[in-house]
């Protein structure tokens, strides 16, 4: 029961104040919720269920879950799927998990929780808009649509910016830590993504890191906590809409 309570608290804290206000205002009726709340609730449920299922399947033949009952395996899989996106608790030794499970946890960490919550990461809504933008491109649609609503193009641009900044910093930091410490890319990426997503999970290599690697992780934590758009806007000049625009021309992509 303790693990279930912890998971419930993590989910509550990861949804965001906007969602809870919307739920209370509309008395929990899903069809009356704002698009933001619908995306958060739907994608959060998808991440929790799919994440737990994949971890469970990956660890069937793994060493960490050996000797445990089916119910314990399901609970541990569910717990790690929930906690990977924000809280950073672990009921199993993450270093003993299969590489597939570790990589999945990395993906969950970088997606993170939802805007206005206690969680870090790219955020669920940002990642969904990023995916929907890709899907609309494949379908050759001029607009991004979700739950019978159209998403503004500026929101899509910001989503791509956030995802790009997180990925570039994560990859660069991973390569640096791996080169400095002589550890595998998987271990280095786990630590770096955990830092930038402000999760706190580790495979156990953090205590032995050099000062340089620790500084890299600290900078990632600061970036992840402050937010990519906040930092970007802080160092960018104020942009005024011009009265005239340059001629537009198409270029070949891909």
Where are the predicted features?
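Membrane-proximal intracellular helices of multi-pass ion channels
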Residues: 1-254
